């Protein structure tokens, strides 16, 4: 289904990082070429070997890792990507992306990508609702990022509220919507009318059409 498509998964330092292992597996089973980039903090929650085993690709954390196969890894990978999903996205990484800071492999590669970029915030409710975080998310949308609203439920801190990373199927659906569905209507303007229309020729005459005979 996704053969020939390349997806970058950006994983940041959140307890919800474990969900991305399952997402990576789901994408791989759809024959997608999956590359995982992790922040250093993310490695405290899940080991890079997990992603390497699931995707058959090297999981990159260090920008200056000399064991990569491309000359300029972050640029080469960015050129190949069809979509980037950063999930879970911490408040820290969201702030970096909102202001173009590129100080690790994940943020550097994202900045170099020209494809669709999707961010899925995951954090404490108060952190998510903080005016600064909300402003950063709004700023990302102004730069053509798509933001997935967090789910509501019990968080790692035992609070109940919004801030949970959505389930893997929801995240997968966002990716599929972007790269697996034909967009043959993209750029086409469609007019929907509930009855007869009239277009003036001059102050006296007009062109019209019959009613559809559909009544509500």
Please place each PLM-identified region on the residue numbering:
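A cross-family phosphate/adenosyl-ligand binding-site feature
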Residues: 1-118, 124-210
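Conserved small/polar residues in nucleotide/adenosyl-binding loops
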Residues: 214-216
């Amino acid at each position: 289904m996704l053969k020939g498509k390349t997806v970058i998964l950006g994983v940041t330092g959140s307890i919800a990082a474990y969900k991305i292992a399952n997402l990576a597996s789901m994408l791989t089973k759809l024959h997608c070429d999956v590359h995982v980039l992790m922040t250093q903090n993310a490695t405290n929650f899940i080991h890079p070997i997990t992603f390497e085993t699931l995707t058959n690709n090297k999981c990159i954390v260090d920008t200056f890792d000399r064991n990569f196969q491309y000359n300029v890894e972050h640029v080469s990978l960015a050129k190949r990507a069809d979509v980037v999903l950063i999930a879970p996205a911490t408040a820290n990484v969201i702030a970096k992306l909102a202001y173009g800071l590129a100080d690790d492999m994940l943020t550097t590669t994202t900045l170099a990508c020209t494809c669709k970029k999707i961010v899925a915030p995951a954090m404490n409710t108060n952190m998510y609702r903080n005016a600064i975080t909300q402003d950063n998310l709004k700023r990302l949308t102004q730069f053509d990022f798509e933001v997935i609203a967090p789910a509501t439920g019990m968080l790692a801190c035992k609070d109940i509220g919004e801030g949970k990373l959505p389930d893997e199927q929801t995240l997968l659906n966002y990716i599929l919507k972007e790269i697996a569905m034909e967009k043959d209507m993209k750029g086409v303007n469609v007019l929907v009318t509930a009855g007869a229309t009239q277009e003036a020729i001059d102050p006296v005459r007009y062109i019209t059409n019959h009613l559809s005979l559909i009544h509500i």
